[in-house]
């Protein structure tokens, strides 16, 4: 699993993205992931866009990553790889991003979200992922590691992590961090807690916290936090409603605004907020939002 996160030679997903006919949606099934109308809908919509539009979307994403290094005063030239995380259906955009990252001197690392309980973190998915066939199932099994989580397991996993990072230290040292494509618009899901599901005991919760803290420190020693960066961009999926194409196009417009112009506006807001003790947020018209943030 450590190697998957830093080695561009493990190119299962990259090969699908670069060498498939993306106009033929059957490529989606090559991943072995669940494919729903969200994945096919996004792919169909992106296929309706011109290459210029796709390149512009990808450029916003890749430039955001590059600018993260610049604004953080970090040297991107030290890095040779970037981790792309995305939802199936966005392959046209990801393909353009892969090529643009190459122009920056970065190879792409793309791995599947964790499947085994040893590597999963609750029901959250990091990596490339398809649809979720049964959200309740994912929720029910979010703490299956309660089956085996004990002090000995924590020690073994941390030792294995350390050994793996030692083996792939050179690859980890030149890894730049994640570039994430998130989605929104999913229908609300209210999980039901079931007594049959495995759940952490209080002692296991402390063990999991210890494991998270220690594994984070190990990762930071090899993929140095002060040298890496990230970017996140988000797009809607068809589940958002019948206005999906229009909403998607409007999000593209927002994402492709001149960042230099709005960077100045954002910095002005940040500088002003730095002088405040609290901020009061009130809704307009029928919006009843009333928040006080300290």
Regions found by a protein language model. Give the residues of each.
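Active-site bordering "gate/hinge" segments
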Residues: 1-294
């Amino acid at each position: 699993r450590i190697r998957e996160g830093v080695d561009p030679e493990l190119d299962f997903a990259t090969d699908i993205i670069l060498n498939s006919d993306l106009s033929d949606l059957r490529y989606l099934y090559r991943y072995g992931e669940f494919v729903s109308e969200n994945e096919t809908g996004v792919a169909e919509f992106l296929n309706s866009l011109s290459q210029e539009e796709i390149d512009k979307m990808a450029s916003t994403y890749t430039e955001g990553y590059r600018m993260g290094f610049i604004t953080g005063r970090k040297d991107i030239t030290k890095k040779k790889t970037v981790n792309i995380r995305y939802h199936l259906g966005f392959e046209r955009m990801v393909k353009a991003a892969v090529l643009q990252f190459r122009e920056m001197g970065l190879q792409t690392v793309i791995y599947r979200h964790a499947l085994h309980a040893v590597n999963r973190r609750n029901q959250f998915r990091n990596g490339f992922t398809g649809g979720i066939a049964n959200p309740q199932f994912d929720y029910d099994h979010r703490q299956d590691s309660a089956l085996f989580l004990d002090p000995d397991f924590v020690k073994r996993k941390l030792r294995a992590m350390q050994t793996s990072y030692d083996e792939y230290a050179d690859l980890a040292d030149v890894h730049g961090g994640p570039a994430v494509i998130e989605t929104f618009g999913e229908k609300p899901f209210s999980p039901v807690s079931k007594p049959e599901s495995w759940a952490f005991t209080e002692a296991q919760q402390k063990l999991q916290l210890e494991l998270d803290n220690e594994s984070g420190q190990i990762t930071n020693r090899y993929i140095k936090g002060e040298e890496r960066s990230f970017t996140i961009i988000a797009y809607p999926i068809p589940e958002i409603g019948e206005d999906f194409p229009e909403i998607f196009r409007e999000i593209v417009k927002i994402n492709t605004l001149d960042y230099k112009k709005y960077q100045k506006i954002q910095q002005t807001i940040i500088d002003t907020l730095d002088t405040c003790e609290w901020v009061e947020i009130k809704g307009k018209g029928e919006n009843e939002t009333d928040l006080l943030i300290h």
